[in-house]
From Swiss-Prot:
Name listed for the protein in its UniProt record: Bifunctional protein FolD 2
Record keyword Hydrolase present: yes
Keywords of the record: Amino-acid biosynthesis, Histidine biosynthesis, Hydrolase, Methionine biosynthesis, Multifunctional enzyme, NADP, One-carbon metabolism, Oxidoreductase, Purine biosynthesis
InterPro entries to which the protein is assigned, alphabetical: Aminoacid_DH-like_N_sf, NAD(P)-bd_dom_sf, THF_DH/CycHdrlase, THF_DH/CycHdrlase_cat_dom, THF_DH/CycHdrlase_CS, THF_DH/CycHdrlase_NAD-bd_dom
Cellular component aspect of the GO annotation: cytosol
Function: Catalyzes the oxidation of 5,10-methylenetetrahydrofolate to 5,10-methenyltetrahydrofolate and then the hydrolysis of 5,10-methenyltetrahydrofolate to 10-formyltetrahydrofolate.
Pathway(s) per entry: One-carbon metabolism; tetrahydrofolate interconversion
Reaction catalysis annotation: (6R)-5,10-methylene-5,6,7,8-tetrahydrofolate + NADP(+) = (6R)-5,10-methenyltetrahydrofolate + NADPH; (6R)-5,10-methenyltetrahydrofolate + H2O = (6R)-10-formyltetrahydrofolate + H(+)
Lineage, highest ranks first: Bacteria, Pseudomonadati, Pseudomonadota, Gammaproteobacteria, Pseudomonadales
Family of this protein: Belongs to the tetrahydrofolate dehydrogenase/cyclohydrolase family.
Organism: Ectopseudomonas mendocina (strain ymp) (Pseudomonas mendocina)
GO function terms (MF aspect): methenyltetrahydrofolate cyclohydrolase activity; methylenetetrahydrofolate dehydrogenase (NADP+) activity
Amino acid sequence: MSAVLSPKLIDGKAAAARVLAEVTEDVRTLKAAGIKPALAVVLVGDDPASQVYVRNKVLRAEECGIRSLEHKLPADTAEADLLALIHSLNADYSVHGILVQLPLPAHIDETRVLQAINPLKDVDGFHAENVGGLSQGRDVLTPCTPAGCLRLLQDSCGDLTGKHAVVIGRSNIVGKPMAALLLKAHCSVSVVHSKSANLRELCRQADIVVAAVGKPRLVDADWLKPGAVVIDVGINRIDEGGRSRLVGDVDFDSALTRAAAITPVPGGVGPMTIAFLMKNTLVAARLQHPATGLPLSTLENPA
């Protein structure tokens, strides 16, 4: 079933629901074999947005049948204490995935913390071993947002072989892993950013545009060739007419006149990020129990 509605709107909520259904089915398969997938979520401090994100992740895990373990630490937690918790979770065979909610308080070294997570339990896909493996085209735990974007593209376009993709943005969380995933899918990939010359002209050549640069409504119809497929990763809060609203990096109404398919903001990429966190937790559990040999739909659909 395609994730494209009308023929233009890519429905991220519907696609995410399908991914979560796959995960739920595979959780049952693993549980029948005595494996109970578990995700540990670590939150340091009381940032309201982070609390909402953690709550949503825990809720989705429970809906899929994944056991969730919340570790809420005060904002003044010492880095050494946080690292000690991570080492404890690494050693706990009943925990298959570890997620440390970002951002961390300023006194904690984010890189040191993320690199302390066992790569096989790194469900965010941020560990250097997973980043390097992805760049080499290996099957590793992959950052959730770009993995979700790839699934939307595959649902919308089918085989991506030979397509020219332009990724706007070079972040370690989205831009770089997105480019690596598209290369693995046999696309020709260009990575552009705010310092790129002829940015608009480069985008006009693309069959696929992934916008992940954090600039509200940067990309409009004039940036697109007719029939392009557009994935908008941007989430920008702006004030418009005295009201606060969320918009993407793409001028949606303008781009809709030229794109063959496009994700909305909200309701496009966002739901896929949490869905792929659940999928990564499932895959992590499977990777930590390779002897089972169980066929799982989440492994048959790796993106």
